[in-house]
Swiss-Prot record:
Keywords assigned: 2Fe-2S, Electron transport, Iron, Iron-sulfur, Metal-binding, Nitrogen fixation, Transport
Binding site for [2Fe-2S] cluster: C11, C24, C56, C60
Cofactor: [2Fe-2S] cluster
Biological process terms in GO annotation: nitrogen fixation
Binding partners and assembly: Homodimer.
SUPFAM superfamilies: Thioredoxin-like (SSF52833)
Similarity annotation: Belongs to the 2Fe2S Shethna-type ferredoxin family.
Protein name: Ferredoxin, 2Fe-2s
InterPro entries documented for this protein: Fdxn_Azotob-type (IPR048111), Thioredoxin-like_sf (IPR036249)
Primary role: Ferredoxins are iron-sulfur proteins that transfer electrons in a wide variety of metabolic reactions. Might be involved in nitrogen fixation.
Disulfide bond annotation, renumbered to this chain: none
Cofactor comment: Binds 1 [2Fe-2S] cluster.
Source organism of this protein record: Azotobacter vinelandii (strain DJ / ATCC BAA-1303)
Length: 107
């Protein structure tokens, strides 16, 4: 793969049940990753946009979290249905998806 135009990082951190910070893994990160992967495949974008799981991105209380570079744009409370919107609106359209942007007070 050549240098990607965008890189999507999906937090997939897991912690034990009852951990005070929770985890994106327990908040559906696997489904979010799979949804992004399917959108990239369907739109033939896998050669332009990299998709990677990562450890903790910080705002665990707001998971599942997604971080996109360039621009360091963080999305929180992301659900699988948001993947298509984020790809279409942000990555292809150039406008971040305001409904899921991580609030400044937590990141």
């Amino acid at each position: 793969m050549a240098k990607p135009e965008f890189h999507i990082f999906i937090c997939a951190q897991n912690r034990p049940a009852g951990h005070p910070r929770g985890s994106c893994g327990a908040k559906g990160a696997e489904g979010v990753y799979n949804a992004f992967a399917q959108v990239l495949i369907q739109k033939n974008l896998t050669n332009r946009i990299a998709l990677t799981t990562t450890g903790c991105l910080g705002p665990c209380q707001a998971g599942a979290n997604v971080l996109i570079y360039p621009g360091a744009v963080m999305y929180s409370w992301v659900e699988p249905a948001d993947a298509a919107i984020i790809v279409e609106q942000h990555l292809l359209g150039g406008e971040p998806y305001a409904d899921k942007l991580t609030p400044a007070e937590i990141w």
